[in-house]
């Protein structure tokens, strides 16, 4: 299962963003300049007592206001509530209970979500009595907090994580490889999923934005069991006219976090765009297995060098992904579509790969004999041994005399030796260096 999602909702000016910033701290998890996300600070990672979760800040809900922008903000909040595992409903303890609070409470009850009610702006003990009128909302015990001063947040977070879904609720999904289809609007994500499923399950249209949210499709084939997640395409900031598009972007990012393999779909008839680089860069940063699919290959005039030249151009553009696997398809004609799940499974297998410690040390010892670490000052890096400490992605710890003696070029050399010796195509690998006294 992915990380739980907590939506912070309430009418305007009750302190939602203050609470969001307090919970997020400096742990904003989105790469800079992501469309409508980082700049607006609506999506971040938080942690409490070793429980990691995602928080979403929403625009203020004004139920009776028909202004277009306000209506869009209301729809944003509804989308966030739909996505959430827990809804954190914030009210203003100084202003007291309002009709708008009652309307929001009514909306939340209809959503049938786990709700935690927080009464904000209780900055001193004398104001504690202000919470009691909020029992009238019928949403359980109101919790007094001061987001600006950080008061009561520990008790609040205890209550929030208490309502997280149990980790084994969807245990059967562990058998499934989760694949997120990402890319700009209209590159053929839904068409590819429909081809794989053999049915018109998704709306397929040349109107960008027909996939508003991430949709999961379960499929079992000879290759294995898969969950295919079709996401809304990410656009350039200038094209995000509707406030609702922010939450499509958020949902795409959440889908990447919950995926094992990310498939970036690119239109062969168009150049790779900056937003393609950004979104797959995010998948790379959080260490997902990656497959790049070039769709609409049937529309390209080809000779025997076309595919190689196209792949070389992509490798240059995506230079931070030297390990990515590539596949050229046509979702429309079905060309090479039968290879998609097989290649995704290979990427996933490499993502989960474990190497025995003895074999690992043989490879590294030979690599050191072939090329000694460079001398820094009067000292040379010594590698005592290496062991694998994790998967998804494969993570290796090198125990050395002093990590400060490691030059970036030698780190790259060691990673290349591991990749030459073991197939890690389609996945990043992590190398850590720790000091061990002789």
Curated annotation (Swiss-Prot):
One of its GO terms (biological process) is ribosome biogenesis. GO terms for molecular function: ATP hydrolysis activity; GTP binding; ribosome binding. SUPFAM superfamilies: P-loop containing nucleoside triphosphate hydrolases. GTP 2 binds at residues 183-190, 230-234, 295-298. Signal peptide: none annotated. Keywords: GTP-binding, Nucleotide-binding, Repeat, Ribosome biogenesis. PROSITE patterns: G_ENGA. Pfam families: KH_dom-like, MMR_HSR1. Residues 353-437 form the KH-like domain. Residues 4-168, 177-352 form the EngA-type G domain. GTP 1 binds at residues 10-17, 57-61, 120-123. Coiled coil: none annotated. SMART domains: AAA. GTPase that plays an essential role in the late steps of ribosome biogenesis. HAMAP family: GTPase_Der (MF_00195). Belongs to the TRAFAC class TrmE-Era-EngA-EngB-Septin-like GTPase superfamily. EngA (Der) GTPase family. Associates with the 50S ribosomal subunit. This is GTPase Der. It comes from Clostridium novyi (strain NT).
């Amino acid at each position: 299962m992915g990380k739980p999602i907590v939506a912070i909702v309430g009418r305007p000016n009750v302190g939602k963003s203050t609470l969001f910033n307090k919970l997020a701290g400096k742990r904003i998890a989105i790469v800079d300049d992501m469309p409508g996300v980082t700049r607006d600070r609506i999506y971040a990672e938080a942690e409490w007592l070793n429980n990691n979760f995602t928080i979403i800040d929403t625009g203020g809900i004004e139920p009776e206001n028909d202004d277009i922008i306000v209506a869009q903000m209301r729809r944003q909040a509804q989308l966030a509530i739909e996505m959430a595992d827990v809804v954190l409903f914030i009210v203003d303890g100084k202003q007291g209970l309002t009709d708008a609070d009652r309307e929001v409470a009514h909306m939340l009850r209809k959503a049938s979500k786990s709700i935690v009610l927080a009464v904000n702006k209780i900055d001193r003990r004398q104001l504690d009595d202000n919470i009691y009128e909020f029992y009238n909302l019928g949403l359980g015990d109101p919790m007094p907090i001061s987001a600006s001063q950080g008061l009561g947040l520990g008790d609040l977070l205890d209550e929030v994580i208490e309502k997280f879904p149990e980790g084994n609720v969807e245990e059967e999904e562990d058998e499934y490889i989760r694949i997120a289809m990402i890319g700009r609007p209209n590159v053929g994500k839904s068409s590819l999923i429909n081809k794989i499923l053999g049915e018109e399950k998704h709306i397929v249209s040349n109107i960008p934005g027909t996939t508003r949210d991430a949709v999961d499709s379960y499929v079992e084939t000879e290759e294995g069991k898969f969950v295919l997640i079709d996401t809304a395409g990410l656009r350039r900031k200038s094209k995000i006219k509707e406030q609702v598009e922010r939450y499509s972007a958020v949902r795409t990012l959440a889908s990447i976090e919950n995926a094992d393999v990310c498939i970036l779909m690119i239109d062969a008839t168009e150049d790779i765009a900056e937003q393609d680089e950004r979104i797959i860069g995010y998948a790379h940063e959080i260490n997902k297995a990656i497959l790049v699919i070039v769709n609409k290959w049937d529309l390209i005039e080809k000779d025997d060098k076309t595919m190689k030249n196209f792949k070389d151009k992509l490798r240059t553009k995506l230079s931070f992904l030297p390990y990515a696997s590539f596949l050229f398809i046509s979702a429309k004609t079905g060309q090479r579509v039968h290879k998609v799940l097989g290649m995704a499974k290979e990427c996933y297998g490499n993502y989960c790969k474990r190497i025995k410690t003895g074999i690992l040390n043989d490879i590294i010892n030979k690599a050191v004999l072939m090329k000694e670490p460079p001398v820094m000052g009067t000292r040379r890096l010594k590698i005592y041994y290496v062991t694998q400490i994790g998967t998804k992605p494969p993570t290796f710890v090198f125990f050395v005399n002093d990590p400060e003696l490691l030059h970036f070029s030698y780190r790259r050399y060691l990673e290349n030796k591991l990749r030459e010796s073991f197939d890690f195509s389609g996945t990043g690998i992590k190398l850590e260096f720790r000091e061990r006294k002789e």
